[in-house]
């Protein structure tokens, strides 16, 4: 099949399937692609091609993720599906595949299970704003409407418990397998599901519209002109002669003006999200800015040293530690471009973290750096990644 041209006229949204093992996430992903392919909006995919998810690396961690894309009449979607539970946890915590919304898949025959709860909690912690529910396998409960209603109530109360709007969340009933097999009644449910995703999950704020932030990777001096900081623009855009703050490692950010912007040795009028750019900073000494700091729109981000985080400790087979760690553990926390040493405090009643655990804890860094809720980091020992984390709440 010829490659579809990327159509920028449609809004782009990133979504993913989440839910308990064997509740039908991958079958649903295949069903969505297959049903939409009949309208020429996607390439049909079978279960096996999605299930054979390729490995990718994010923050030094290997994750298996399948990425597929499709369109509805309204939008263009990038959809991520992970084969294993640990892949979900790693994916969410590293932010490898950003999710603007989730499709929570729950089997009507089982109802919510432990990983259903875990994925809802994790989605809340890493900032997935909304989800739509697909109640799968209802074909196995024909005539048992009361049972289906009970499961639906259970899902709504679970969503509310974790801070989602359980009452307003759309719940679509269907059978992913029957839709994949071409049953017209169940294909219609997939169309209903995508209508709900189109209408209930909001279009995210474009990276360009967010406040400017560049993570400093390198600093050098140009004789007679001043100090240049280079790095990747994470978000927003910046015009020449704009003010920025140098944030991180000091209690108070330092303000400066950008007098020149360079990319690939060419002068630019502006830098925007995704660019690798060099910014010439007025009146800044080479020692005033270093790798690991950020240049940001004044007032948009402040340095912090203490926060709550959701973390995943890698298993031994994943290159992680061979032994648990305890509450006096002091690894390096790698944010954007640099390592900062810090300590961890466990929640009450927890004595240790085993390789493979997913846990919430408090981190206190030895020097403040630019972080906000949702900032991702790696946990490292001597340059080796042993875990990943996401900031869930700022404390200091």
UniProtKB/Swiss-Prot annotation:
The enzyme's E.C. designation: 3.6.5.3
CDD domains, sorted: EF_Tu, EFTU_II, EFTU_III
GO CC terms of this entry: cytosol
Keyword Nucleus: no
Location of region: G1: 19-26
Domain tr-type G, residue spans: 10-205
Subcellular location: Cytoplasm
Function: GTP hydrolase that promotes the GTP-dependent binding of aminoacyl-tRNA to the A-site of ribosomes during protein biosynthesis.
The protein's assembly and partners: Monomer.
Family note: Belongs to the TRAFAC class translation factor GTPase superfamily. Classic translation factor GTPase family. EF-Tu/EF-1A subfamily.
Record's protein name: Elongation factor Tu
Organism from which the protein derives: Mycoplasmopsis pulmonis (strain UAB CTIP)
């Amino acid at each position: 099949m010829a490659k579809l041209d990327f159509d920028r006229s449609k809004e782009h949204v990133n979504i993913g399937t989440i839910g308990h093992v064997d509740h039908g996430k991958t079958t649903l992903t295949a069903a969505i692609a297959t049903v939409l392919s009949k309208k020429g909006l996607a390439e049909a995919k079978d279960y096996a091609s999605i299930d054979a998810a390729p490995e990718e690396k994010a923050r030094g961690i290997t994750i298996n993720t399948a990425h597929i894309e499709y369109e509805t009449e309204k939008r263009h979607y990038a959809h991520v599906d992970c084969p294993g539970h640990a892949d979900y946890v790693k994916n969410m915590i590293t932010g490898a595949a950003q999710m603007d919304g989730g499709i929570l898949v729950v089997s009507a025959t089982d109802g919510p299970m432990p990983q259903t709860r875990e994925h809802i909690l994790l989605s809340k912690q890493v900032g997935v704003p909304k989800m739509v529910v697909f109640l799968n396998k209802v074909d196995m409960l024909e005539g048992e409407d009361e049972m289906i209603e009970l499961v639906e109530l259970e899902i709504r109360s679970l969503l509310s418990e974790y801070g989602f709007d359980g009452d307003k969340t759309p719940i679509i009933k269907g059978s992913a397998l029957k839709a994949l097999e071409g049953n017209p009644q169940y294909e219609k449910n997939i169309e209903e599901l995508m209508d709900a995703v189109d209408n209930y999950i909001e279009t995210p704020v474009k990276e360009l519209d967010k406040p400017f932030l560049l993570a400093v990777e390198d600093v050098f001096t140009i004789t007679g002109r001043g100090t240049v900081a280079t790095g990747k623009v994470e978000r927003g855009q910046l015009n020449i002669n704009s003010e920025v703050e140098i944030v991180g490692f000091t209690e108070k950010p330092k303000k400066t003006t950008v007098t020149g912007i360079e990319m690939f040795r060419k002068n630019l009028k502006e830098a925007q999200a995704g660019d690798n750019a060099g910014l010439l900073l007025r009146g800044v000494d080479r020692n005033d800015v270093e790798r690991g700091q950020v240049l940001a729109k004044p007032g948009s981000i402040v340095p912090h040293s203490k926060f709550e985080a959701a973390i995943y400790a890698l298993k031994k087979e994943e290159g992680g530690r061979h032994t648990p760690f305890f509450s006096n553990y002091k690894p390096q926390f790698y944010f954007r471009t640099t390592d900062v040493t810090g300590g961890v405090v466990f929640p009450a009643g927890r004595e240790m973290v085993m390789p493979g655990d997913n846990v919430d804890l408090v981190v206190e860094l030895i020097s403040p750096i630019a972080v906000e809720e949702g900032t991702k980091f790696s946990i490292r020992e001597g340059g080796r990644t042993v875990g990943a984390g996401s900031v869930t709440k700022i404390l200091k």
